[in-house]
Amino acid sequence: MHVTGDRTAEHGLSTVGYDDEGVAGQSWDLIRDGVLAGYQLDRRMALLKGFGRSNGCAFSDGPGHMPLQRMANVSLQPAADGPSTADLIAGVEDGIYILGDKSWSIDMQRYNFQFTGQRFFRIRNGRLDGQLRDVAYQATTTDFWGSMEAVGGPQTYVLGGAFNCGKGQPGQVAPVSHGCPAALMRGVRILNTAEEGAS
């Protein structure tokens, strides 16, 4: 598993030449080979925690707000020689192929979460077998990433994003991108949101 923070990504919503403390945009590893390797840092946090320098993560959404430490474009990187999406699907006997994201709910510790996608397809015997609706997936962060069995190659990578990532008191809103290749997860809890809403 390889996850990067990147303030330089082409077309990234959190891409900057310089952050709001004057630190140049840069790219760094957050997770390398499945092990925590780096952090998002502004000048204050770098000083408090003994790091040599900020990696350019200070952002203010306007002149009336102090800069906060904010997320860079955070992306799960593809495997250099990873499989195609079709090859990943071919290895699934019974599952769901989820494209994009639509809504999300996550607790303050960023541990328990529920997400929905934009499109859903049933997988049966290694093939797509019709569309689904009213699908959500639910997990804890550690269980979810621990369920990852395979990551697709560069041809499966997509950079998406959100314009309204909110943080702080008083609240500030920042745009941010997240990139991801196709990935195969096993044993993730799936919900029928139509049934859940009716109960």
Where are these regions (language model features)?
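N-terminal small-residue-enriched
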Residues: 1-199
